[in-house]
């Protein structure tokens, strides 16, 4: 769990913002949302494979767009 030290004369909202940012970097909220409901292993593999395919397609489309030159 992320821990922050509140500095002298630091407003509460600034400290809270720092804490939220550290939680986001640690990935706590994403982990909680992922574990909120049980996901079967086959569903998890299927979702991960679909995400990998989507990443690859996005990467290839970026590379192809870079190569096309319209003069």
Swiss-Prot record:
By its UniProt entry, which Pfam families does this protein fall under?
Answer: Ribosomal_S21 (PF01165)
Q: Give me any GO biological process, just one.
A: translation
Does the keyword section mention Nucleotide-binding?
Answer: no
Q: Name one GO molecular function term.
A: structural constituent of ribosome
Which controlled-vocabulary keywords does the entry list? Ribonucleoprotein, Ribosomal protein
Query: Which Gene3D superfamilies does the record cross-reference, listed alphabetically?
Result: Ribosomal protein S8
What is a single cellular component term in the Gene Ontology annotation?
Answer: ribosome
Question: Member of which family?
Answer: Belongs to the bacterial ribosomal protein bS21 family.
NCBIfam families registered for this protein in UniProt: S21p
Please report the name of this protein according to its UniProt entry. Small ribosomal subunit protein bS21
């Amino acid at each position: 769990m992320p821990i922050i030290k509140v500095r002298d004369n630091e407003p509460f909202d600034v400290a809270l913002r720092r804490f939220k940012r550290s939680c986001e970097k640690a990935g706590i909220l994403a982990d909680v949302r992922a574990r909120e409901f049980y996901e079967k292993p086959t569903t998890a593999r299927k979702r991960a494979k679909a995400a990998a395919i989507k990443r690859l397609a996005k990467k290839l489309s970026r590379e192809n767009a870079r190569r096309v030159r319209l003069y």
